[in-house]
């Protein structure tokens, strides 16, 4: 029978000092012996996805204490990728994931907490906490802050839906008037919550449902809706049950590695492919699997991308649907239900509710259940009122979107495409693979060939695009922006946005060893591995070299003879794999990150071999 970890600090005469300090935090005499549960919050006023989380920790804590636990809250950092984007701040985004994972480990292990409730929301916070959860392997439940409502504005006598990416594109488009750009900017992000499309934050929060680590609705219920409060309340109650199951009943099925096992990671990736999620999710799933010592790699993702169809199309891949529409169509449980009916789901995986996924779908898939409360839950909709407050409205759609032929979520037979929304490409320019979000690629661009125009940084690429150096038909190559070379693997949303604003969005391809925002669409290929700084072939590309992209064949090729590549490699080995004439200040903290960073095909995690004796 496992012993409560917290007993290390609460039992025995030699722990008198620790107990004295616990008492100073409010622990009462009869509390000693109860499980100590860490409430891992990420409230910050810097990030709209987290600005409403201030009171959420105490809401969860209250339920933990009612259920017989001791709740102790702490906060992690949280970087807003949108605000950090387009300048040196983006260098810090991906490295913050490792800091978050480490800080959770530090706090939980230093104080011997027995379990965790992770209150996350945005891009690197959910992955960082997930890495920590898989690393620590103590009972955990995730509950996120929820998606933002889609923005709305009236243009040309039509009401249109908006999101952050619309504001960015219009702001860079020289044909858009200042007045129209400002109108869109003011309407794009109306409420608290994670940005309203299927960007990285919402993709990751959806994946926690598929992994079994969060409750149904976690990924899709709006941040502003009153129904979301119940997810926090239930998380507080449920974590105490999970904790007691493990420590008092020796039930290891309550542990995250036994819930989010390999089969669950396959489910999460299947969901990601089916919903056309952010390509960043590949990084984070690979990293989390490694933390959980689960054998799951790019080969698995490649295999799944060939057989899982694209069942749900959401902004930025279409302006028609946002997260509020996904929820109306039944949310993650509805997509998983369609995958299950198509024979593409491992339905015997476990969940934090103590059910198998099959049992959970029977209760929560709107195409199966007749439970009126569940159906009402998925009719929760937006209010259209600007606010930074959680649970501030109780609006409902008149009816659910259960149209599986032409609606937001579709059956396999009526899929947006029979191949999924993400694909792994490989070839001599990326021998360990690269990622493209096929959900955002127009059909005429699935095959593309053109001459390279090479930039040594995102900054120079932006300058080149806006300065008219990039021409239709070219492949824009941005290198030395990988985990090590950046360092920090910046998102390339501005280059892709500016290509669109310059009328080149469908006329050019973009290849990088950096990554893309979940808001990116178009023929944008990232995560080229190995990265340039690690000797990847992307570092050998010259202006004018022909690059051939064939998504149906999953290939990407630099059309240069091998003998020429070998000669270039020998020369580059002498020069060192560094960008030419790039002016960038790199702090000691970022240099420390770069010194251990692996390429994207490994999840951009730290190279553990450098620590092994």
Curated annotation (Swiss-Prot):
It is an enzyme of class 4 (lyase). The active site is at residue 517. The modification N6-carboxylysine is found at residue 124. It holds the Pfam family ILVD_EDD_N. Its EC number is 4.2.1.9. Pathway: Amino-acid biosynthesis; L-isoleucine biosynthesis; L-isoleucine from 2-oxobutanoate: step 3/4; Amino-acid biosynthesis; L-valine biosynthesis; L-valine from pyruvate: step 3/4. [2Fe-2S] cluster binds at residues 122, 195. Homodimer. This is Dihydroxy-acid dehydratase. The gene is ilvD.
């Amino acid at each position: 029978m496992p012993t409560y970890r917290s007993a290390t600090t609460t039992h025995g005469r030699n722990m008198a000092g620790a107990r004295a300090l616990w008492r100073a935090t409010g622990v009462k005499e009869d509390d000693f012996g109860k499980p100590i549960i860490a409430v891992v919050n990420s409230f910050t006023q810097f990030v709209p996805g987290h600005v409403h989380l201030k009171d959420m920790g105490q809401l969860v804590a209250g339920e933990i204490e009612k259920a017989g636990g001791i709740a102790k809250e702490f906060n992690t950092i949280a970087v807003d990728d949108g605000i950090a984007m387009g300048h040196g701040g983006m260098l810090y985004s991906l490295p913050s994931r490792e800091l978050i994972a480490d800080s959770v480990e530090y706090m939980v292990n230093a104080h011997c907490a027995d379990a965790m409730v992770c209150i996350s929301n945005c891009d690197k916070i959910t992955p960082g906490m997930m890495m920590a959860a898989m690393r620590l392997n103590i009972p955990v439940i995730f509950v996120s802050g929820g998606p933002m409502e889609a923005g709305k504005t009236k243009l040309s006598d039509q009401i249109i839906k908006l999101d952050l990416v619309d504001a960015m594109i219009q702001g860079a488009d020289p044909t858009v008037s200042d007045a129209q750009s400002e109108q869109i900017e003011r309407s794009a992000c109306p409420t608290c919550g994670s940005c309203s499309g299927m960007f990285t934050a919402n993709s990751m929060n959806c994946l926690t449902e598929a992994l079994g680590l969060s409750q149904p609705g976690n990924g899709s219920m709006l941040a502003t809706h009153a129904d979301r409060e119940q997810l926090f309340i239930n998380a507080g109650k449920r974590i105490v049950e999970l904790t007691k199951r493990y420590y008092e009943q020796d039930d290891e099925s309550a542990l995250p590695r036994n819930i989010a096992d390999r089969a669950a990671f396959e489910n999460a990736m299947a969901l990601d492919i089916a919903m056309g999620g952010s390509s960043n999710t590949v990084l984070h799933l690979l990293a989390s699997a490694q933390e959980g010592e689960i054998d799951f790699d790019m080969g698995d993702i490649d295999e799944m991308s060939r057989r899982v169809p694209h069942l749900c199309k959401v902004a930025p891949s279409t302006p028609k649907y946002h997260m509020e529409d996904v929820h109306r169509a039944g949310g993650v449980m509805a997509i998983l239900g369609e995958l299950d009916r198509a024979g593409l789901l491992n339905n015997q995986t476990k969940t934090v509710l103590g059910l198998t996924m099959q049992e959970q779908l029977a209760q929560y898939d709107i195409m199966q259940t007749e439970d009126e409360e569940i159906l009402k839950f998925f009719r929760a909709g937006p209010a259209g009122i600007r606010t930074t407050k959680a649970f501030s409205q109780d609006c409902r759609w008149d009816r659910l979107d259960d149209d599986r032929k032409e609606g937001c979520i579709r059956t396999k037979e009526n899929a947006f495409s029979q191949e999924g929304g993400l694909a792994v490409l490989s070839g001599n320019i990326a021998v360990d693979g690269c990622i493209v979000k096929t959900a955002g690629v127009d059909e005429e661009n699935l095959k593309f060939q053109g001459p390279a125009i090479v930039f040594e940084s995102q900054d120079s690429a932006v300058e080149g695009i806006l300065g008219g150096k990039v021409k239709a038909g070219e492949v824009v190559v941005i290198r030395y922006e990988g985990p090590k070379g950046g360092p920090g693997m910046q998102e390339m949303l501005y280059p892709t946005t500016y290509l669109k604003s310059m009328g080149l969005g469908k006329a050019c391809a973009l290849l990088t060893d950096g990554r893309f925002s979940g808001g990116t669409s178009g023929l944008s290929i990232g995560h080229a591995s190995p990265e340039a700084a690690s000797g990847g072939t992307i570092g050998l590309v010259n202006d004018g070299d022909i690059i051939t992209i064939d998504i149906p064949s999953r290939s990407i090729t630099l059309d240069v003879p091998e003998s020429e590549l070998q000669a270039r490699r020998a020369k580059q080995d002498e020069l060192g794999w560094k960008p030419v004439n790039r002016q960038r200040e790199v702090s000691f903290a970022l240099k420390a990150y770069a010194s251990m960073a692996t390429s994207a095909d490994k999840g951009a995690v730290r190279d553990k071999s450098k620590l092994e004796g």
